[in-house]
A protein has these predicted regions:
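Bacterial N-terminal signal peptides
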Residues: 1-10
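Extended, subdomain-level signal for the structured scaffold at the beginning of enzyme domains
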Residues: 11, 16-145, 157-249
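Conserved, well-structured core segments that form or line functional sites
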Residues: 146-150
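Catalytic nucleophile serine of serine hydrolases
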Residues: 153-155
Length: 249
């Protein structure tokens, strides 16, 4: 009997070890906690489609997603359109609606659990992503561990101050895109946002790429994946998935 229990115990441990080796690491979505467009008083937050469309791609591929925001808790939402079926699917998914409504604070995140960090857009990101040292440290660790750093639209505001162990900025020398100066001008917020994202990324050494207004444009370079605008959100999710498959996370 003792021998049988020992054999069963060894078998269970081996099975669990084998299972753990094949478990996919999670993906961390970052959303803003900021709810106003500067002095305008207009509401903002994370842009729903820039969460839902990448989420759909990665969720259906079997990846578990967690949410973090600078302040934790329920983040403000912008671009709330449930006529978009993907937005509706995300919003009505009880598990993930609960997750985003109870987003973690950066101090609650263990970077080792994640293969990817993705910064969702929405104008609020321009106020609370760039200077958040805790989020930058999380992203740097994920990247240094061989992971992916991604963002869409204003989300790459979170990339501008990420430094690597060698002291260089993450975006230095890499092809990057994000919400463009022309798009910021088109929505008449050039003088409202605290900085122009395109300019700041260039200052950090990024090789900034862009297409015309509201065109889908995604670039992947050395495990950094960025998209230009809301129209690029799904494609960013697809590019992340492709990179994850290449890395076998």
């Amino acid at each position: 009997m003792l021998l049988m229990l020992t054999v069963l115990s060894i078998g269970f441990v081996q099975a669990q070890t084998k299972k753990s080796k094949h478990m996919k690491k999670k993906i961390l979505f970052v959303v803003t906690s900021h709810d106003k467009k500067g002095s305008t008083g207009e509401d903002t937050g994370y842009y729903l489609g820039e969460v839902s469309h990448p989420w759909e791609v990665l969720y259906k591929a079997g990846y578990e997603i967690d949410f973090v925001s600078p302040k934790g808790g329920t983040p403000p939402v912008d671009g709330f359109d449930l006529k978009d079926p993907v937005n509706k699917e995300f919003w009505e998914n009880k598990e993930y609606k609960n997750k985003i409504d109870h987003s973690m604070t950066p101090s609650q995140v263990d970077p080792k659990e994640y293969s990817t960090i993705f910064y969702a857009g929405g104008h609020g990101a321009m106020w609370d992503f760039a200077d958040n040292k805790e989020l930058a440290a999380i992203a740097s660790e994920i990247y240094e561990n061989g992971g992916i750093v991604a963002g869409v639209c204003h989300g790459p505001a979170g990339l501008v101050n990420i430094r690597l162990n060698n002291g260089k900025y993450l975006v230095d020398g890499k092809k990057i895109n994000a919400f463009t100066n022309e798009e910021e001008s088109e929505v008449k917020l050039t003088n409202v946002v605290p900085f122009l994202l395109e300019n700041r990324l260039k200052e950090r050494g990024a090789q900034f790429e862009k297409s015309g207004l509201w065109q889908n444009h995604v670039v992947a370079d050395q495990r950094v994946i960025t998209g230009q605008n809301p129209q690029s959100a799904k494609s960013v999710g697809e590019a992340i998935l492709k990179e994850l498959h290449n890395k076998s996370f």
